[in-house]
């Protein structure tokens, strides 16, 4: 029993780290989009360091998958039924639901971003300039002035109002489950 729950705890920690990474990526994307929008008509005034930091994020994507092997093992074996404290069993199930929700939340951001950016990069003008020997500043300046590029940056900046708040809530619930496992089985 203790060994199985230690596996669950390890898996919850892995998923928590992933959720934290999703939060960071979404926040950086939002910050970058806001930065580019701020310098829409004056890209020459934007910091080169900031452009190098933020400029590539709109065109990159990263997918995450939840890790649920330990939970599947609990369900397939009799371990879940043998957990004496039923509140803990329920909390573990809820923690995995939270993990799923976090991934769906990130996926919502990711798909909205992807759709908006695709409308921009599919424009013939964008394809033409991105194949020329232009600096990142020139490409971003051109991109943000395209109606589709401007719309993409606005979409990225508005997808979720406060991702930090939502992801932090998810991580807090996972932390509470980990603490509960430690309290019961350590």
PLM regions with names:
Residues 1-186:
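Long, hydrophobic alpha-helical segments that serve as membrane-spanning/inserting helices
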